[in-house]
Amino acid sequence: MRKLFLFFSLMGSLYLSADAKENNMKNEIATLGGGCFWCLEAVFEETRGVLEVVNGYAGGDVVNPRYEQVSMGKTNHAEVVQVTFDANIVSYEEILKIFWLIHDPTTLNRQGNDIGTQYRSVIFYHNIKQKEVAEASIKLFSTKFLNPIVTQLLPMPTFYKAEDYHQDYFKNNPNQGYCSFVVAPKVEKFKGVYKDLVK
């Protein structure tokens, strides 16, 4: 009987420890657009403290947009990623620091050969604190680029999750042409510059 009591006591302690660990997590969401969402997703999936990355669309006029519509540039939606992260491990400031590294925020509605409003540089803030942090980050990083930053800073609109085949795209298609020549170099750049932020 004593052994049974000790067993249940131990199991109870383990559950409490798991609950305490979960409660100590400080989850936040960052929503960012900076060119093709495959690129941002691939990098943030390699970032420590990031719990989930979801590709999607935001900022446009069409409800429940499809990729075919967005890619034509007629919905006003941007390709974005929603990054869920534990702010106890990686801060919103650090998320933005990575964001500036892996895309060019000085080119209007364009990233490399990807051209159109759907590829615009944009930060959608979820609260006033994020807005303030983003404003400070834009001011700081403006000194690090030759041309002015054209990144939009806007309140978070409705987010529409992209089609399933767009999720974990680089992970599932590492040898696809665009992934090899565009996505992979961004991932390697991130790992080389911000080694302390890599999982």
Where are these regions (language model features)?
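Low-complexity, intrinsically disordered regions enriched in charged/polar residues
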Residues: 1, 10, 181-184
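Bacterial N-terminal signal peptides
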Residues: 3-15
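Flexible coil/turn and secondary-structure edge motifs
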Residues: 18-199
